[in-house]
Amino acid sequence: MTNRDAAADETIEARLAREDDREAVLAFCARTWDDGDYIQYVWEDWLRDSSGALLVATLAGRPVGLAHLRMMSPEEAWIEGVRVDPEARRRGVARVLISRAARL
């Protein structure tokens, strides 16, 4: 799933997370909440979760968003841990992540 950012003329893409996304994702997650974030504690579990998918959104190749999809049953899914880098907000990053998750 992609979304064109007309102002910056850059494409937002959503894909499955990779281990090498960890550092960049945790960096923007640390800037998301004033009191810290739990993503650093669940990253490895979510990355290996066979009952769902960990998605990363990128802008100009740089991770700027995160969402975890967990399949609760064949008909029901749960989306959790949605995060968007504060510097990339208001560009449709979460929309791209949710749309990609809905197609899985």
Where does each model-flagged region fall?
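A generic structural signal for beta-strand entry/edge sites
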Residues: G52, P74-E76
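Conserved acetyl-CoA-binding loop-helix of GNAT-fold acetyltransferases
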Residues: G81-P86, R90-L104
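Conserved beta-strand in the GNAT
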Residues: V56, R62-R70, W78-R83
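Short amphipathic alpha-helix that is part of the acyltransferase structural core
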Residues: T2-Y41
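Short, low-complexity Ser/Thr-rich regulatory SLiMs
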Residues: R18, M71-S73, P86
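A short helix-loop-beta-strand connector motif used in the catalytic cores of GNAT acetyltransferases and
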Residues: E44-V56, G65
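Acyl-donor-binding surface of acyltransferase catalytic domains
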Residues: M1-A8, I98-L104
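Alpha-helical elements of Rossmann-like donor-binding domains used by nucleotide-donor carbohydrate transfer enzymes
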Residues: A24-F28, R62, V96, R100
